[in-house]
């Protein structure tokens, strides 16, 4: 093969969302000749020397690229990741970590679709069956009925985690795969919620929803429904925090109506003082197993609070969440134990995907290499992951 071009090495690393330091660690590039691993990698990217094949193989694995990609003459154009619902057309924001994550998701989706087609799965009629000019209450009822969602059961959950598990089961029961992914396999590559909150990939055979698990757990249910509405509309794309885009407002309104019907917000008085609003919204959200941000957004949309009040509340709730997140991180660091590798992985990929991969392996329709690719683990970890899932019911 021809020589590897330095710009290809740099492109592959940057589109994988890795810094020089993280990439050097990922490919196990050790210090040598007075240079750190990161400095050696930087030299390779400047064309100081050709990387040995062994290093290229490690790069292919760490950067999630086929080996042949490192012999391209020039970096290819960015792949289609669907619509960017976070901003107006022409103002899309590029983030290498997010781009790498979506490329990984798309690759998994292709394998999932292949497994489903081998099993002769029927197309899902609801995907792309709705339009954004449908009245919000009508589509909300249609989606909730299709899910057979009972708000009483959702709210009877012990907390936000259990409520999300109930909703996730309902969504996956309709043929949609719900994944929790917020990095490229390591906390070093965490993608902030400010970059993306959720992703919907529309397909009538293998529709996918991805939720950024860096977000508050109380927000996961709303994000799942928001992305599900995108699937009903036949949309593929990235969702963020800003709801300034019309289609995002519509999906927010439908998701919000499913979880908290507008009639339930009538008890909130207009003109609440800030501290009163914080307490009332917090109590209301806790009782319904939803996020305070969602409730305050609905109050804004209904004209029950001003935009300035909503902005102040959003800032306050976000600061409290960041403080809570830091406390939880400190607890985990101090604790001796914690969730095992397989418990965490099971939770991220969901019971529906675990079940599909298990059946496909049993029927000989997929290799362990491809199964690992779909589940986001190495081939040798597939069987322990599936076995532990079967023993514990997949949750």
Question: How should these model regions be labeled?
Answer:
Residues 1-395:
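Active-site hotspot residues in diverse enzymes, especially metal/ion-binding acidic/histidine motifs
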């Amino acid at each position: 093969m021809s020589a590897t071009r330095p710009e290809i090495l740099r492109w592959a690393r940057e589109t994988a969302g890795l810094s020089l330091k993280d990439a050097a660690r990922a490919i196990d590039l050790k210090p040598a000749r007075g240079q750190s691993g990161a400095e050696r990698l930087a030299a390779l990217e400047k064309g100081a020397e050709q990387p040995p094949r062994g290093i290229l193989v490690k790069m292919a694995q760490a950067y999630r690229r086929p080996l042949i990609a490192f012999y391209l003459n020039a970096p290819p154009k960015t792949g289609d990741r669907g619509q960017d619902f976070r901003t107006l057309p022409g103002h899309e924001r590029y983030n290498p970590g997010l781009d790498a994550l979506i490329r990984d998701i798309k690759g998994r989706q292709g394998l999932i679709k292949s497994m489903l087609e081998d099993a002769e799965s029927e197309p899902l009629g609801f995907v792309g069956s709705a339009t954004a000019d449908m009245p919000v209450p009508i589509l909300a009822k249609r989606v909730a009925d299709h899910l057979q969602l009972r708000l009483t059961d959702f709210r009877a959950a012990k907390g936000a985690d259990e409520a999300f598990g109930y909703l996730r089961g309902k969504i996956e029961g309709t043929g949609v795969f719900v994944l929790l992914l917020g990095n490229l396999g390591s906390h070093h590559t965490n993608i902030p919620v400010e970059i993306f909150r959720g992703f919907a990939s529309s397909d009538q055979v293998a529709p996918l929803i991805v939720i950024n698990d860096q977000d508050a757990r109380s927000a996961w249910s709303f994000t799942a429904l928001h992305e599900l509405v995108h699937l009903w509309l036949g949309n593929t794309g990235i969702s963020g925090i800003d709801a300034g885009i019309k289609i995002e407002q519509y999906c927010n309104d439908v998701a919000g109506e499913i979880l908290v019907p507008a009639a339930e917000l009538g008890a909130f008085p207009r003109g609440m003082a800030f501290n009163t609003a914080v307490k009332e919204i917090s109590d209301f959200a806790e009782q319904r197993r939803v996020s305070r941000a969602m409730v305050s957004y609905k109050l804004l949309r209904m004209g029950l609070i001003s935009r300035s009040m909503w902005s102040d509340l959003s800032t306050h709730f976000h600061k409290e969440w960041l403080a809570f997140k830091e406390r939880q991180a400190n607890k985990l660091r101090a604790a001796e134990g914690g969730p095992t590798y397989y418990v965490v992985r099971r939770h991220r990929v969901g019971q529906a995907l675990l079940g599909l991969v298990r059946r496909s392996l049993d029927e000989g329709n997929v290799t362990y290499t491809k199964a690992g690719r779909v589940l986001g683990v190495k081939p040798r970890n597939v069987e322990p992951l599936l076995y532990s899932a079967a023993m514990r019911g997949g949750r």
